[in-house]
C-alpha cells in the first residue's frame, strides 16, 4: 500500500512494495512522452536545497505528464531560507500549497524532519551522504526491466562506495532480493558498516574486492560511481586509484555477454565513452526510466486504492 506514504528511506519498503511500483512504472512508460489527467488538480512542491539535474527534472516532468502542477525551487538562493527561515517553516509553507513535497538537502535527516512537519506525503530526493531512495528504486527497476527478474543476479558496485548516497540506498533496496553483492573499491572507500550490516542481516551474500578484473567475469550488473577527488589528500594517489576503477573496452572483453553497466550520472571519466555504443551500456536508458518510475511513485502515493 503506497497511498499517503512518505518515501524517506529505502529500508521502509518491502519486496512486495517494489514489485507493485515496478508494475505501475512499466504501465506508465506508455505515457512518459505524452500527457494524461490522472492527477489533474494535484500540486507537487519541489524543495531542492542542493543542486540536481536528473532527479529534480524527472520529478517535475513526471508530475506534468500525469496532469498535475509543479511549484518550488531548485536552489535556496532567492528564497526565504536566505533570510534565515528554518527548514521546518519552509516545509510548513509548502505543505499549505501542495499535495506532495519532494525535498533534496545536504544534511542527512532533513527529509525525515520534513515528513514530521508536513501533513502531505514527503519524498526524499536525496539527503546528506546516506539516503537517495528513489534513485535506488530506479536502479533496481532498470535491472528488473532488463533481466525480467532480480533474484539470482550477481551485482558489482564499484567506485567510492562510502560517500555515494546512491550506494547506501541501492544496497538496502537490493537486500529485498536474493542477489550476491560484490563491493569493488579501495579499502578506505568501502561502504558504511551500517549499510553492510543491514544487508548481511537480511541474508545477502557479499564479498569485497580491490580489483575489478578478478570478478568482472562473474557479474550480471556493474554499477559504477565516481571516485571523489576531494576525499584524497595526495593528488597523485587520487590519479592512481581512479585509474583502477574505470570501465574500459579492455575490461569488458572478460565480461559476460549479457552484463549491463549502470551509473547514476553524472559521470566524469569512470566509464570509457566508447562503451556508450555497446550493448552493455544501460545508463542512459536508466536515466530515461526516471520519468515513468517517478510517475508511478507519485501516482501511487496520491491515488487512493
Swiss-Prot record:
The record's catalysed reaction(s) read:
carbamoyl phosphate + L-aspartate = N-carbamoyl-L-aspartate + phosphate + H(+)
Top-rank EC class of the record's enzyme? transferase
- GO biological-process terms attached to the record: 'de novo' pyrimidine nucleobase biosynthetic process; 'de novo' UMP biosynthetic process; amino acid metabolic process
Q: Which cysteines are joined by disulfide bonds?
A: none
Q: Which PROSITE patterns match?
A: CARBAMOYLTRANSFERASE
InterPro entries (alphabetical): Asp/Orn_carbamoyltranf_P-bd, Asp/Orn_carbamoylTrfase, Asp/Orn_carbamoylTrfase_sf, Asp_carbamoyltransf, Asp_carbamoyltransf_Asp/Orn-bd
What are the record keywords, sorted?
Answer: Pyrimidine biosynthesis, Transferase
SUPFAM superfamilies, A to Z? Aspartate/ornithine carbamoyltransferase (SSF53671)
The domain of life is Archaea
The answer on whether this UniProt entry bears the keyword Secreted reads no
- MF annotations from Gene Ontology: amino acid binding; aspartate carbamoyltransferase activity
Pathways involved = Pyrimidine metabolism; UMP biosynthesis via de novo pathway; (S)-dihydroorotate from bicarbonate: step 2/3
Listed transmembrane segments: none
Q: Where does L-aspartate bind?
A: 83, 165, 226
Q: Which residues of this UniProt protein bind carbamoyl phosphate? A: 54-55, 104, 132, 135, 265-266
Which EC numbers characterise this protein's activity in its record? 2.1.3.2
Reported function: Catalyzes the condensation of carbamoyl phosphate and aspartate to form carbamoyl aspartate and inorganic phosphate, the committed step in the de novo pyrimidine nucleotide biosynthesis pathway.
Q: How does it assemble?
A: Heterooligomer of catalytic and regulatory chains.
| UniProt similarity note | Belongs to the aspartate/ornithine carbamoyltransferase superfamily. ATCase family.
Q: What is this protein called?
A: Aspartate carbamoyltransferase catalytic subunit
Q: What's the source species' lineage?
A: Archaea, Thermoproteota, Thermoprotei, Thermoproteales, Thermoproteaceae
Amino acid at each position: 500500500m503506497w497511498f499517503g506514504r512518505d518515501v524517506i528511506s529505502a529500508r521502509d519498503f518491502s519486496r512486495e512494495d517494489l514489485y507493485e511500483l515496478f508494475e505501475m512504472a512499466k504501465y506508465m512508460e506508455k505515457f512518459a512522452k505524452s500527457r494524461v489527467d490522472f492527477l489533474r488538480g494535484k500540486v507537487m512542491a519541489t524543495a531542492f536545497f542542493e543542486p540536481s539535474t536528473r532527479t529534480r527534472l524527472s520529478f517535475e516532468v513526471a508530475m506534468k505528464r500525469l496532469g498535475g502542477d509543479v511549484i518550488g525551487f531548485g536552489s535556496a538562493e532567492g528564497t526565504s531560507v536566505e533570510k534565515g527561515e528554518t527548514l521546518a517553516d519552509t516545509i510548513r509553507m509548502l505543505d499549505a500549497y501542495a499535495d506532495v513535497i519532494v525535498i533534496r538537502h545536504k544534511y542527512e535527516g532533513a527529509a525525515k524532519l520534513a515528513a514530521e512537519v508536513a501533513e502531505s506525503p514527503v519524498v526524499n530526493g536525496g539527503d546528506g551522504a546516506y539516503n537517495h531512495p528513489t534513485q535506488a528504486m530506479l536502479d533496481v527497476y532498470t535491472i528488473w526491466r532488463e533481466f525480467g527478474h532480480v533474484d539470482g543476479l550477481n551485482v558489482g558496485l564499484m567506485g567510492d562506495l562510502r560517500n555515494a548516497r546512491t550506494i547506501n540506498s541501492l544496497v538496502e533496496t537490493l537486500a529485498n532480493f536474493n542477489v550476491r553483492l560484490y563491493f569493488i573499491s579501495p579499502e578506505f572507500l568501502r561502504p558504511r558498516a551500517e549499510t553492510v550490516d543491514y544487508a548481511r542481516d537480511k541474508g545477502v551474500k557479499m564479498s569485497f574486492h580491490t580489483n575489478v578484473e578478478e570478478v568482472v567475469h562473474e557479474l550480471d550488473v556493474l554499477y559504477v560511481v565516481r571516485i571523489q577527488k576531494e576525499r584524497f589528500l595526495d593528488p597523485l594517489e587520487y590519479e592512481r586509484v581512479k585509474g583502477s576503477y574505470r570501465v574500459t573496452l579492455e575490461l569488458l572483453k572478460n565480461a559476460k555477454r549479457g552484463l549491463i553497466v549502470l551509473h547514476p550520472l553524472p559521470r566524469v571519466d569512470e566509464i570509457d565513452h566508447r562503451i556508450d555504443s555497446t550493448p552493455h551500456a544501460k545508463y542512459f536508458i536508466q536515466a530515461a526510466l526516471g520519468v515513468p518510475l517517478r510517475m508511478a511513485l507519485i501516482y501511487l502515493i496520491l491515488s487512493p486504492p
